[in-house]
Amino acid sequence: MDMKRHLKSALKQLGFDKPRKAQIIPMNTLDAGQDAIVIAATGSGKQVIYETVGLAHSDKLTIVIEPLLALIYNQVQTLQEHGVSVDYIDMTRSKEDIDKILHKVRKGKLNFLYVTPERLQSHSFIEAMQHLDVFMVVIDECHSITEWGYNVS
């Protein structure tokens, strides 16, 4: 299976010459606007899959729900180093910072917005997201739902 030109271009912008074989099908699936779940080992390149597709559709927003702050900071920094317009909202951000970030989002100035799961409990955040042109919502580290989430016993 081959990749479309816009995906190859996005992959190159992220610093990769070609995808791993196991990345191609999920990239093409997401690119077509379909849902996908990728279950793979740490270090296998799951992040590259959604970042490539999100970047290829940079006219729309990709929201990444990431429970681990260290990963948010690392991924945001890496994307910024590759010239990608990205920001994040977590509990360390002031209301003023969040308002500025959401303003950038509404103006279409961000390709990626990383948020922590608790942000989804914010009525104002959900309301702001309802009126945006969102291409993709990614749940990274989804195994943590069962590790840290609400469990009925």
Protein language model features and the residues they cover:
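Conserved pre-motif I regulatory segment
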Residues: 1-41
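Short acidic active-site motifs
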Residues: 25, 97-101, 124-125
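Walker A/P-loop
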Residues: 32-52, 63-68
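Loop/turn-to-beta-strand initiation segments
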Residues: 35, 60-63, 85, 109-113, ...
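Conserved Walker A/P-loop ATP-binding site and its immediately adjacent core
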Residues: 47-48, 56, 60-93, 97, ...
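Conserved motor-coupling elements within RecA-like helicase/translocase cores
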Residues: 99-112
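SF2 helicase catalytic motif II
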Residues: 111, 121, 125-153
